[in-house]
Amino acid sequence: MDKRYKIKQAIVHITYTCEHHCPMCYANAGIRKEEPSLEYLCKVIDRLLELDIKDITLVGGDPAIYTHIVELVVHAKKNGAMLSILSNTLEFNGKREDVLDFIDVYEGTIHHSDPGKHDSFCKVEGAYDKLINNLKFFSDRGKSVGVALNMIPYNYNVLADSVESIIEKGIKIDHIIMQRIIQFGRATGMNNFEISSEMLGEVLRQVESLENKYGIKVIFEDPLPFCAIDKKYYKYMHPCEWGISKISVDYKGNLSRCGADVFHSFGSVFDDVDYLWTTDDNIKAFREKKYLPVKCHECSLFFKCGGGCPISRNPEHGFTADYLSKSGKII
Protein backbone atom coordinates (compact mmCIF):
# COMPACT_ATOMS: atom_id res chain seq x y z
CA MET A 1 0.00 0.00 0.00
CA ASP A 2 1.10 3.56 -0.75
CA LYS A 3 2.38 4.88 2.60
CA ARG A 4 0.50 8.14 2.02
CA TYR A 5 -2.74 6.23 2.40
CA LYS A 6 -2.02 4.04 5.40
CA ILE A 7 -5.07 3.88 7.68
CA LYS A 8 -4.04 5.24 11.07
CA GLN A 9 -7.41 5.75 12.77
CA ALA A 10 -10.83 4.10 12.69
CA ILE A 11 -14.02 5.81 13.83
CA VAL A 12 -16.43 3.05 14.86
CA HIS A 13 -20.18 3.69 15.11
CA ILE A 14 -21.06 1.07 17.72
CA THR A 15 -24.72 2.10 18.03
CA TYR A 16 -27.21 4.50 16.49
CA THR A 17 -29.23 4.73 19.69
CA CYS A 18 -29.17 8.04 21.58
CA GLU A 19 -31.34 9.62 24.27
CA HIS A 20 -30.94 13.06 22.65
CA HIS A 21 -32.96 14.38 19.71
CA CYS A 22 -30.73 16.99 18.10
CA PRO A 23 -32.29 18.50 14.96
CA MET A 24 -29.29 17.88 12.71
CA CYS A 25 -28.14 14.44 13.93
CA TYR A 26 -26.51 12.18 11.34
CA ALA A 27 -27.85 9.08 13.12
CA ASN A 28 -31.35 9.81 11.80
CA ALA A 29 -34.26 8.91 14.07
CA GLY A 30 -36.42 5.99 13.04
CA ILE A 31 -33.74 3.92 11.34
CA ARG A 32 -31.08 1.42 12.38
CA LYS A 33 -32.27 1.08 15.95
CA GLU A 34 -31.14 -2.49 16.49
CA GLU A 35 -28.36 -2.96 19.05
CA PRO A 36 -25.35 -4.98 17.91
CA SER A 37 -24.17 -7.94 19.92
CA LEU A 38 -21.05 -7.63 22.04
CA GLU A 39 -19.58 -10.67 20.32
CA TYR A 40 -19.85 -9.14 16.87
CA LEU A 41 -18.52 -5.74 17.92
CA CYS A 42 -15.52 -7.46 19.49
CA LYS A 43 -14.89 -9.18 16.15
CA VAL A 44 -14.98 -5.81 14.40
CA ILE A 45 -12.47 -4.39 16.90
CA ASP A 46 -10.26 -7.48 16.63
CA ARG A 47 -10.20 -7.16 12.85
CA LEU A 48 -9.13 -3.52 13.06
CA LEU A 49 -6.32 -4.46 15.42
CA GLU A 50 -5.33 -7.28 13.06
CA LEU A 51 -5.03 -4.61 10.34
CA ASP A 52 -2.72 -2.66 12.69
CA ILE A 53 -5.32 0.07 13.20
CA LYS A 54 -4.93 0.65 16.93
CA ASP A 55 -6.19 4.23 17.21
CA ILE A 56 -9.94 3.68 17.58
CA THR A 57 -12.65 6.19 18.45
CA LEU A 58 -16.07 4.93 19.52
CA VAL A 59 -19.01 7.06 18.38
CA GLY A 60 -22.75 6.70 17.81
CA GLY A 61 -25.56 7.59 18.44
CA ASP A 62 -24.27 7.68 21.96
CA PRO A 63 -21.69 4.93 22.48
CA ALA A 64 -21.68 5.50 26.26
CA ILE A 65 -25.21 4.11 26.58
CA TYR A 66 -24.50 0.93 24.61
CA THR A 67 -25.59 -1.93 26.88
CA HIS A 68 -22.21 -3.71 26.81
CA ILE A 69 -19.96 -0.66 26.65
CA VAL A 70 -17.86 -1.70 29.67
CA GLU A 71 -17.18 -5.19 28.33
CA LEU A 72 -16.39 -3.79 24.88
CA VAL A 73 -13.80 -1.25 26.03
CA VAL A 74 -12.17 -3.78 28.35
CA HIS A 75 -11.83 -6.21 25.44
CA ALA A 76 -10.49 -3.53 23.08
CA LYS A 77 -7.95 -2.12 25.52
CA LYS A 78 -6.66 -5.50 26.63
CA ASN A 79 -6.04 -6.40 23.01
CA GLY A 80 -3.99 -3.30 22.26
CA ALA A 81 -6.38 -0.51 21.23
CA MET A 82 -5.81 3.16 22.01
CA LEU A 83 -9.40 4.16 22.77
CA SER A 84 -11.25 7.45 22.56
CA ILE A 85 -14.99 7.95 22.97
CA LEU A 86 -17.23 10.79 21.79
CA SER A 87 -20.52 10.90 23.67
CA ASN A 88 -23.43 13.21 24.48
CA THR A 89 -23.54 11.92 28.05
CA LEU A 90 -20.39 9.98 29.06
CA GLU A 91 -22.80 8.15 31.33
CA PHE A 92 -21.62 4.54 30.81
CA ASN A 93 -24.84 3.20 32.27
CA GLY A 94 -23.78 4.37 35.74
CA LYS A 95 -20.45 2.49 35.53
CA ARG A 96 -17.95 5.31 35.07
CA GLU A 97 -15.47 3.76 37.49
CA ASP A 98 -15.42 0.56 35.45
CA VAL A 99 -14.11 2.22 32.27
CA LEU A 100 -11.44 4.47 33.81
CA ASP A 101 -8.52 2.16 33.05
CA PHE A 102 -9.65 1.24 29.56
CA ILE A 103 -10.50 4.47 27.71
CA ASP A 104 -7.72 6.97 27.03
CA VAL A 105 -9.68 10.02 25.82
CA TYR A 106 -13.16 11.20 26.84
CA GLU A 107 -14.97 13.68 24.58
CA GLY A 108 -18.38 15.30 24.92
CA THR A 109 -20.42 17.51 22.58
CA ILE A 110 -21.49 20.93 23.89
CA HIS A 111 -24.17 22.83 21.94
CA HIS A 112 -24.24 26.15 23.83
CA SER A 113 -22.74 28.05 26.75
CA ASP A 114 -26.21 28.42 28.28
CA PRO A 115 -27.27 25.12 29.92
CA GLY A 116 -30.91 25.78 29.07
CA LYS A 117 -30.12 26.37 25.41
CA HIS A 118 -27.96 23.24 25.30
CA ASP A 119 -30.85 21.22 26.74
CA SER A 120 -33.34 22.84 24.39
CA PHE A 121 -31.20 21.98 21.38
CA CYS A 122 -30.92 18.29 22.24
CA LYS A 123 -34.45 18.21 23.70
CA VAL A 124 -33.44 16.61 27.01
CA GLU A 125 -33.82 18.49 30.30
CA GLY A 126 -30.70 18.28 32.46
CA ALA A 127 -28.50 17.07 29.59
CA TYR A 128 -25.92 19.84 30.06
CA ASP A 129 -25.49 19.25 33.79
CA LYS A 130 -25.18 15.50 33.28
CA LEU A 131 -22.44 15.87 30.68
CA ILE A 132 -20.54 18.49 32.67
CA ASN A 133 -20.68 16.30 35.77
CA ASN A 134 -19.22 13.38 33.83
CA LEU A 135 -16.54 15.48 32.12
CA LYS A 136 -15.45 16.67 35.57
CA PHE A 137 -15.43 13.11 36.89
CA PHE A 138 -12.92 12.01 34.25
CA SER A 139 -10.91 15.24 34.38
CA ASP A 140 -10.56 14.98 38.17
CA ARG A 141 -9.07 11.52 37.69
CA GLY A 142 -6.42 12.72 35.30
CA LYS A 143 -7.98 11.49 32.08
CA SER A 144 -7.67 13.34 28.79
CA VAL A 145 -10.86 15.34 28.18
CA GLY A 146 -11.97 17.02 24.96
CA VAL A 147 -15.00 19.02 23.86
CA ALA A 148 -16.66 18.79 20.45
CA LEU A 149 -18.20 22.02 19.18
CA ASN A 150 -20.51 22.20 16.17
CA MET A 151 -20.05 25.49 14.33
CA ILE A 152 -23.63 26.48 13.51
CA PRO A 153 -25.66 29.72 13.55
CA TYR A 154 -27.19 28.66 16.89
CA ASN A 155 -23.92 28.94 18.79
CA TYR A 156 -21.11 30.33 16.60
CA ASN A 157 -20.76 33.48 18.72
CA VAL A 158 -20.64 31.72 22.12
CA LEU A 159 -18.15 28.93 21.41
CA ALA A 160 -15.43 30.51 23.56
CA ASP A 161 -17.96 31.10 26.33
CA SER A 162 -19.00 27.45 26.06
CA VAL A 163 -15.43 26.31 26.66
CA GLU A 164 -14.59 28.86 29.34
CA SER A 165 -17.71 28.03 31.34
CA ILE A 166 -16.51 24.42 31.48
CA ILE A 167 -12.99 25.42 32.51
CA GLU A 168 -14.43 27.60 35.28
CA LYS A 169 -16.03 24.47 36.73
CA GLY A 170 -12.57 22.99 37.29
CA ILE A 171 -12.47 20.80 34.20
CA LYS A 172 -9.14 20.61 32.36
CA ILE A 173 -9.81 20.60 28.63
CA ASP A 174 -6.96 19.18 26.56
CA HIS A 175 -8.46 19.83 23.14
CA ILE A 176 -11.48 21.11 21.27
CA ILE A 177 -12.87 19.49 18.12
CA MET A 178 -14.41 21.93 15.65
CA GLN A 179 -17.07 20.51 13.36
CA ARG A 180 -19.49 21.75 10.73
CA ILE A 181 -22.90 20.26 10.02
CA ILE A 182 -23.70 19.13 6.49
CA GLN A 183 -26.99 18.19 4.86
CA PHE A 184 -27.17 14.61 6.06
CA GLY A 185 -29.37 12.63 8.46
CA ARG A 186 -31.97 14.90 10.05
CA ALA A 187 -30.33 17.88 8.33
CA THR A 188 -30.92 16.54 4.81
CA GLY A 189 -32.27 19.26 2.55
CA MET A 190 -31.61 22.00 5.12
CA ASN A 191 -28.97 24.70 4.96
CA ASN A 192 -29.87 26.44 8.22
CA PHE A 193 -26.98 24.71 10.01
CA GLU A 194 -24.40 26.10 7.58
CA ILE A 195 -22.23 29.03 8.64
CA SER A 196 -21.44 32.13 6.63
CA SER A 197 -17.95 33.53 6.01
CA GLU A 198 -18.66 36.20 8.62
CA MET A 199 -19.66 33.59 11.21
CA LEU A 200 -16.55 31.59 10.38
CA GLY A 201 -14.35 34.61 11.02
CA GLU A 202 -15.91 35.02 14.46
CA VAL A 203 -15.40 31.31 15.21
CA LEU A 204 -11.72 31.48 14.28
CA ARG A 205 -11.14 34.55 16.44
CA GLN A 206 -12.59 32.68 19.41
CA VAL A 207 -10.58 29.55 18.68
CA GLU A 208 -7.32 31.48 18.58
CA SER A 209 -8.22 33.23 21.83
CA LEU A 210 -8.84 29.90 23.57
CA GLU A 211 -5.56 28.49 22.29
CA ASN A 212 -3.57 31.52 23.41
CA LYS A 213 -5.25 31.85 26.81
CA TYR A 214 -5.44 28.20 27.86
CA GLY A 215 -3.03 26.29 25.61
CA ILE A 216 -5.87 24.14 24.33
CA LYS A 217 -5.15 22.04 21.24
CA VAL A 218 -7.47 22.93 18.36
CA ILE A 219 -8.63 20.20 15.97
CA PHE A 220 -10.70 20.98 12.88
CA GLU A 221 -12.44 17.69 12.10
CA ASP A 222 -13.56 18.87 8.67
CA PRO A 223 -11.01 21.45 7.56
CA LEU A 224 -11.77 24.67 5.74
CA PRO A 225 -10.39 25.85 2.39
CA PHE A 226 -7.55 28.34 2.83
CA CYS A 227 -9.27 30.85 0.54
CA ALA A 228 -12.12 31.10 3.08
CA ILE A 229 -9.94 32.18 6.01
CA ASP A 230 -7.29 34.68 7.01
CA LYS A 231 -3.69 33.50 6.59
CA LYS A 232 -3.06 33.55 10.32
CA TYR A 233 -5.51 30.68 10.74
CA TYR A 234 -3.86 28.35 8.22
CA LYS A 235 -2.07 26.69 11.13
CA TYR A 236 -5.32 25.01 12.18
CA MET A 237 -6.07 23.50 8.78
CA HIS A 238 -5.01 20.42 6.86
CA PRO A 239 -6.34 18.43 3.90
CA CYS A 240 -9.30 16.20 4.75
CA GLU A 241 -7.97 13.00 6.36
CA TRP A 242 -11.09 10.91 5.71
CA GLY A 243 -10.15 8.57 2.88
CA ILE A 244 -6.45 9.22 3.45
CA SER A 245 -5.56 8.06 6.97
CA LYS A 246 -9.01 7.81 8.64
CA ILE A 247 -11.80 5.34 7.96
CA SER A 248 -15.38 4.99 9.19
CA VAL A 249 -16.76 1.63 10.33
CA ASP A 250 -20.32 0.87 11.39
CA TYR A 251 -21.31 -1.78 13.95
CA LYS A 252 -21.79 -4.35 11.18
CA GLY A 253 -18.26 -3.80 9.94
CA ASN A 254 -19.30 -1.85 6.84
CA LEU A 255 -16.72 0.65 5.66
CA SER A 256 -17.14 4.16 4.31
CA ARG A 257 -14.70 6.90 3.47
CA CYS A 258 -16.26 9.21 6.08
CA GLY A 259 -18.81 8.81 8.85
CA ALA A 260 -21.00 11.45 7.21
CA ASP A 261 -20.54 9.91 3.78
CA VAL A 262 -22.35 6.57 3.82
CA PHE A 263 -23.17 7.10 0.15
CA HIS A 264 -19.55 6.14 -0.53
CA SER A 265 -19.47 2.78 1.27
CA PHE A 266 -17.07 0.29 -0.20
CA GLY A 267 -17.02 -3.07 1.57
CA SER A 268 -16.49 -4.71 4.93
CA VAL A 269 -13.74 -4.66 7.50
CA PHE A 270 -13.61 -8.43 7.01
CA ASP A 271 -12.71 -8.03 3.32
CA ASP A 272 -9.25 -7.26 1.93
CA VAL A 273 -9.25 -3.72 3.30
CA ASP A 274 -5.84 -2.76 1.89
CA TYR A 275 -7.02 -3.69 -1.61
CA LEU A 276 -10.31 -1.81 -1.26
CA TRP A 277 -8.55 1.23 0.21
CA THR A 278 -6.35 1.56 -2.87
CA THR A 279 -8.74 0.50 -5.66
CA ASP A 280 -12.21 1.80 -4.79
CA ASP A 281 -13.30 4.28 -7.48
CA ASN A 282 -14.96 6.75 -5.11
CA ILE A 283 -11.97 6.90 -2.79
CA LYS A 284 -9.65 7.41 -5.75
CA ALA A 285 -11.93 10.19 -7.02
CA PHE A 286 -11.75 11.88 -3.61
CA ARG A 287 -7.95 11.70 -3.56
CA GLU A 288 -7.56 12.97 -7.12
CA LYS A 289 -9.82 15.96 -6.33
CA LYS A 290 -10.86 16.48 -9.94
CA TYR A 291 -14.18 17.73 -8.58
CA LEU A 292 -12.47 20.95 -7.48
CA PRO A 293 -12.25 24.03 -9.74
CA VAL A 294 -9.17 24.53 -11.92
CA LYS A 295 -8.27 27.56 -9.78
CA CYS A 296 -7.89 25.27 -6.77
CA HIS A 297 -5.46 22.98 -8.59
CA GLU A 298 -3.46 25.99 -9.78
CA CYS A 299 -3.24 27.48 -6.29
CA SER A 300 0.22 27.37 -4.69
CA LEU A 301 -1.35 26.20 -1.42
CA PHE A 302 -3.42 23.41 -2.96
CA PHE A 303 -1.52 20.50 -1.41
CA LYS A 304 -1.53 22.09 2.04
CA CYS A 305 -5.19 23.05 1.78
CA GLY A 306 -6.87 20.18 -0.05
CA GLY A 307 -9.99 22.19 -0.83
CA GLY A 308 -11.89 21.82 2.45
CA CYS A 309 -14.75 19.34 2.91
CA PRO A 310 -15.74 17.46 -0.29
CA ILE A 311 -19.29 16.80 0.94
CA SER A 312 -20.03 20.10 2.67
CA ARG A 313 -22.88 20.85 0.24
CA ASN A 314 -24.69 17.49 0.22
CA PRO A 315 -23.01 14.06 0.39
CA GLU A 316 -25.75 12.38 -1.61
CA HIS A 317 -24.85 14.54 -4.61
CA GLY A 318 -21.20 13.46 -4.59
CA PHE A 319 -17.96 15.38 -4.18
CA THR A 320 -18.04 19.13 -4.82
CA ALA A 321 -16.13 22.26 -3.86
CA ASP A 322 -16.61 23.37 -0.26
CA TYR A 323 -19.54 25.77 0.08
CA LEU A 324 -17.20 28.28 1.75
CA SER A 325 -14.60 28.08 -1.03
CA LYS A 326 -13.71 31.20 -2.98
CA SER A 327 -12.10 29.02 -5.68
CA GLY A 328 -8.50 29.77 -4.95
CA LYS A 329 -8.76 33.45 -4.01
CA ILE A 330 -6.38 33.88 -1.07
CA ILE A 331 -7.44 36.31 1.66
Task: List the predicted regions and their residue ranges.
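Flexible mid-to-C-terminal extensions adjoining Fe-S/redox cofactors in radical SAM and related proteins
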Residues: 1, 6, 255, 259-331
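Conserved alpha-helical substructure of the radical SAM core
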Residues: 1-98, 102
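Residues immediately within or flanking Cys/His clusters that coordinate Zn2+
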Residues: 11, 15, 19, 237, ...
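Cys/His-rich metal-chelating microdomains
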Residues: 17, 21, 25-28, 243, ...
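Residues that line or immediately flank small-molecule/substrate-binding pockets and catalytic motifs
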Residues: 29, 60, 110, 180, ...
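Radical SAM enzyme [4Fe-4S]-AdoMet core and its adjacent flexible, acidic
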Residues: 36, 82, 102-105, 109-111, ...
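Structural motif corresponding to alpha-helix initiation and N-cap regions
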Residues: 38-42, 66, 92-94, 115, ...
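Hydrophobic pocket-lining residues within nucleotide cofactor-binding pockets
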Residues: 63, 90-92, 151, 181, ...
